[in-house]
Regions:
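Active-site phosphate-binding and catalytic loops of NTP-dependent enzymes
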Residues: 84-92
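Cross-kingdom TIR/SEFIR domain
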Residues: 80, 92-95, 113
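Hydrophobic pocket-lining residues within nucleotide cofactor-binding pockets
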Residues: 18, 107, 115
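Short amphipathic alpha-helical interaction patches enriched in hydrophobic/aromatic residues
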Residues: 22-25, 87, 108
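Single conserved hydrophobic/aromatic residue that forms the stacking wall/gate
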Residues: 112-121
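Catalytic NTP-binding/metal-coordinating core of nucleotidyl cyclase/transferase enzymes
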Residues: 2-78, 82
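A short glycine-enriched loop-to-beta-strand structural element that forms part of the catalytic core
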Residues: 94-109
Length: 121
């Protein structure tokens, strides 16, 4: 039988997603993907700078894990401020608005053979 392991730990999760992403993709897929690539680079850099680790992405969303709630909140605030500055310096077609949430709590991680660790908060 396949071996699996379950662990619990307190962790901090930062989640981001683009407001109106589906509509933006419908209206101008090429421009939306270009804008997302720029914004994704911003959030990835900030997550790294604040000692976080991206553990999942899907479309317009990013999930990152932090050991420190303070670092996660600072990262989220800097990301929102950087996106606001970017939006003020580009045309309307290049602007993106993000929702950002931070959650701290007991997480369950599952490891099954060679499959990646899956967190459930």
């Amino acid at each position: 039988m396949a071996e699996s392991r379950t662990e619990r730990k307190v962790t901090v999760i930062l989640a981001t997603d683009v407001v109106g992403y589906s509509v933006m993709m419908e209206e101008n897929e090429e421009q939306t993907l270009k804008n997302l690539k720029v914004c994704r680079a911003i959030v990835e850099g900030l997550i790294k700078d604040h000692h976080g680790r991206i553990f999942n992405t899907a479309g317009d969303s990013v999930l990152a894990e932090f050991q420190s709630a303070v670092e996660a909140v600072i990262c989220a605030t800097e990301f929102q401020n950087t996106i606001k500055e970017r939006n003020n310096s580009v045309g309307e077609e290049e602007q993106m608005e993000f929702r950002v949430g931070v959650n701290m709590g007991d997480a369950v991680s599952y490891t099954h053979l060679t499959l990646p660790t899956i967190y459930s908060v």
